[in-house]
Structure formats: structure tokens, C-alpha cells
């Protein structure tokens, strides 16, 4: 169970599952108000499993193929709790100026490296990979906490 403050939203962030949604990642995402998957899903059953936990926004990654993947967009912008998020798989493909577009949070994946940074007033979050281990990179997911106009990000690494 995740502690919740009155009036706050918890947004679960996941990426690069590559056909494997680890139980510890599912447990971490449970209780989210919304889940965002930043691509490289590789199996549509993962989307079903995430939708069973919370409303879902997902984008297509470079390894997502087939009719199910064609229904996903390469990027999505959405507003949650008054905060504008922009989601895409590979940050190198970012085609907007987030600050100029009024985006407060950019969520991406692709690198399998969890990272949280802030540039020009925009919070950038890569939740890392919640799928099969790649090289020596950690298995991870992340969350956004939205409380009014304040947004914080937390990366959670799993022992898997």
C-alpha cells in the first residue's frame, strides 16, 4: 500500500517491459490513479494487466509491432490533476518544446536507465525497464505524485 495525501494523485510510470510484467512492478503500480507505459510493451496482454490496475495511457516503442501496436500512437499528451504530461518512447525523438507547449512532465523510456531530471522548469522522468534485465541495468518503475501544482517523481528499483 502506498501512502496517500488528501487531494493527491499517484501516477504509475513503467516502460520497456519487453513482454514481461514482473510481479513486483505490478504490485508497485497497484493503487495508482493512472498508469503510463512509455513503450516497448511487446505483448498486448501487458496492456490488459495494467488496465486491470488503473486507467492506462501507453505509447508505441521501437519494438512494438503488429495490429495491436499500430493502434498506439508514438506520443501522447494528457492532463492529470491539472498537470500536462507528454509521453514518448525515445527522448531523442521529442518533437516539441515542452516548456513552450505548457508541458510540466515528460515521460520517456528506451534507454532502460531510470532517471529523473529537471530542465527549464520541466520534469523529465524515465522509469527504466520493468521487463527482462538488460546488461547490468536495474529493474525499475517510477511514480509521479501530483499535489496541487507540485509534482514529484520517485524511481523504485527492484531486486529481481
Question: Residue spans of the language-model regions?
Answer:
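Active-site environment of divalent metal-dependent phosphoester hydrolases
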Residues: 19-23, 42-46, 63-69, 92-97, ...
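Hydrophobic/aromatic beta-strand patches that form the interior of the parallel beta-sheet core
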Residues: 12, 36, 57-59, 105-107, ...
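Charged helix-capping and loop-helix junction motifs
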Residues: 72-75, 102, 108
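Binuclear metal-dependent phosphoesterase catalytic core
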Residues: 2-8, 77-81, 118, 125-160
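Core catalytic region of metal-dependent phosphoesterases/phosphodiesterases
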Residues: 1-84
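Short coil/turn connectors at secondary-structure junctions
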Residues: 83, 102, 120-121
Amino acid at each position: 500500500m502506498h501512502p496517500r495525501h488528501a487531494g493527491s494523485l499517484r501516477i504509475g510510470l513503467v516502460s520497456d517491459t519487453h513482454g514481461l510484467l514482473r510481479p513486483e512492478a505490478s504490485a508497485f503500480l497497484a493503487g495508482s490513479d493512472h498508469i503510463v507505459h512509455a513503450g516497448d510493451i511487446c505483448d498486448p496482454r501487458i496492456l490488459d494487466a495494467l488496465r486491470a490496475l488503473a486507467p492506462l495511457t501507453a505509447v508505441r516503442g521501437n519494438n512494438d509491432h503488429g495490429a495491436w501496436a499500430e493502434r498506439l500512437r508514438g506520443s501522447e499528451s494528457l492532463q492529470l490533476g491539472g498537470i500536462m504530461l507528454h509521453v514518448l518512447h525515445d527522448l531523442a525523438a521529442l518533437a516539441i518544446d515542452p516548456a513552450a507547449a505548457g508541458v510540466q512532465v515528460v515521460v520517456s523510456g528506451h534507454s532502460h536507465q531510470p532517471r529523473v531530471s529537471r530542465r527549464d522548469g520541466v520534469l523529465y522522468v524515465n522509469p527504466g525497464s520493468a521487463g527482462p534485465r538488460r546488461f547490468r541495468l536495474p529493474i525499475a518503475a517510477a511514480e509521479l505524485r501530483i499535489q496541487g501544482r507540485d509534482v514529484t517523481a520517485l524511481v523504485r528499483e527492484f531486486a529481481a
